[in-house]
Amino acid sequence: MHDITAKDKHVIIIGGGDTGSDCLGTSIRQGAKDVTVLQIMPKEPDERPDNQPWPTFARLYQKTSSMEEGGTYVYSTDSVNFVGSDEEQARVHIEDSTASEGFVADENGHVTGLKVVDVAPGENGPFTRQPGTERVLPADLVLISVGFLHPDTSTLLDQLPVELDKRGNVAR
């Protein structure tokens, strides 16, 4: 097994909670080229909204110490799949095991980007993908830090050899 480092890499962190914030700070301190944190939730307001009057707990935007170190947060965005330089279906090797063919990678099995799409609150579910918003973000290292809201297992996680617990979170 080899050490994983963010040094000189385009890093994408899927998940904007406490663990994602820790990944952001660590990636910056390790010398990443750039770091992008994907948050499926919309950005919280800077000021108390009318529908959350005092003394109700207000969900407000709070900048963490890791955010102050740098990086970019992208809100209301969901990950679709991993991509590579050749844009053909290929297999990605993860710690000597082979994942499903849902991945696209370069000739060496390395992920070079992540396809994402904007989302909005949905009528029949938590989020609806917005047509025409798909794009690819460059990525040499993708860190998955999801779990509090339960990861969507119909996209990226079904492509990985990842075990889920009874609640639908990534098992330890």
Role assignments for model-derived ranges:
Residues 7-17:
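Beta1/beta-strand and adjacent pyrophosphate-binding region of the FAD-binding site
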Residues 20:
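N-terminal Rossmann-fold NAD(P) dinucleotide-binding loop
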Residues 80-89, 163, 169-172:
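Short, intrinsically disordered, charge-balanced linker/junction segments flanking boundaries
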Residues 13, 116, 144:
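Redox-cofactor binding/interface segments in oxidoreductases and associated redox assembly factors
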Residues 1-8, 103-106, 110, 122-172:
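FAD-site-proximal beta/loop scaffold in flavoenzymes
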Residues 41, 49-63, 112-116, 120, ...:
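Flexible glycine/proline-rich, aromatic-decorated loop/lid segments
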Residues 24-81, 90-100:
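Rossmann-like dinucleotide-binding cores of NAD(P)H-dependent redox enzymes
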